[in-house]
């Protein structure tokens, strides 16, 4: 009989963990599917009461949340997690107040469920109407942002959906505590705790279990970096809504108010450099005077931004301290104080560059020429096109839509900020009086 090695034992433990995770994901998805019809029928008043109660519960139990979060932060630092990621992970009293405020905001939004989108009486007398209905079981796959746990719950509940949440293992203590609090609130309303459930995250394969649970899960929404999103979209058999990465471009035309263009560019790059609507590439028209090209580059550098570009191209008009760009720079969503800068020969060259490297999130132009602006808007393929405005405006709240679950860069079902209406489908209801079709 051959003795087991430590490697054999480790493999067995891994196999058992995988089997346990798979069973847990499918069991929770089955329970979610079972309770979904009940949640779909909740009235607006009840949903709003739950959201407001959840906001209060988060504040009342903030010490519990912060303690759990501190364990995640300690583990993150021990593993060498970057401080920028630690910042995304961290929760304090102020951030918890912001999360609670988000739930209150959702409570104040119009309930999309039951909204009649169109209706008419057919020639044969049948009354027909199209109404909004919940999607059903909504799966979320996301990275180390505990606020997404609560945001997803709030938006799912208000739109009549059940939430299956697969967060990052780096936020497991925070997410477990948050979901426990939300489930406790649901229980006080005699509603199933399975309305929101946290899925296991010990292995990456649990994501695959969720995104292939066709028949149990109605939609999966990935939210995070390009690697996560691509893995979900490419591996899913469940329908997905792609919240894309943001390699956002800002084109400065030759006919432009340079001061205004610089202000918009700096705002888009530095307001919050770690979000998907941050400007990542600046394209400068070759027709812009060299002195103004230099002003653009220096303004970025003065704001603390590292400029990447073709050094010879930028040095030709006096720029210094430029990092030589590689092909990867034009593709990059930096999410940092870095930007790629290139000189292009007019709006058509800018459009061509954007078409090659865009993630179809947000693209912007600064120009005084209405015809150039219209050409840019007509030919750029993106969820949002900004004309003389910062890329930072791609946001559900800025659009007047309220809270959002993400920014969709796909073309089917939803595109742009995904708020409550985008978390619903529609149903056609036809009412006759004994009609039969000849």
Swiss-Prot record:
Residues 1-21 are annotated as: Disordered. One of its GO terms (biological process) is L-proline biosynthetic process. PROSITE patterns: PROA. Keywords: Amino-acid biosynthesis, Cytoplasm, NADP, Oxidoreductase, Proline biosynthesis. It is found in: Cytoplasm. One of its GO terms (cellular component) is cytoplasm. Its EC number is 1.2.1.41. Its main location: cytoplasm. It catalyses: L-glutamate 5-semialdehyde + phosphate + NADP(+) = L-glutamyl 5-phosphate + NADPH + H(+). The keyword Cytoplasm applies. Residues 10-21 have a biased composition (Basic and acidic residues). GO terms for molecular function: glutamate-5-semialdehyde dehydrogenase activity; NADP binding. It holds the Pfam family Aldedh. Pathway: Amino-acid biosynthesis; L-proline biosynthesis; L-glutamate 5-semialdehyde from L-glutamate: step 2/2. Belongs to the gamma-glutamyl phosphate reductase family. Catalyzes the NADPH-dependent reduction of L-glutamate 5-phosphate into L-glutamate 5-semialdehyde and phosphate. The product spontaneously undergoes cyclization to form 1-pyrroline-5-carboxylate. HAMAP family: ProA. This is Gamma-glutamyl phosphate reductase. It comes from Corynebacterium efficiens (strain DSM 44549 / YS-314 / AJ 12310 / JCM 11189 / NBRC 100395).
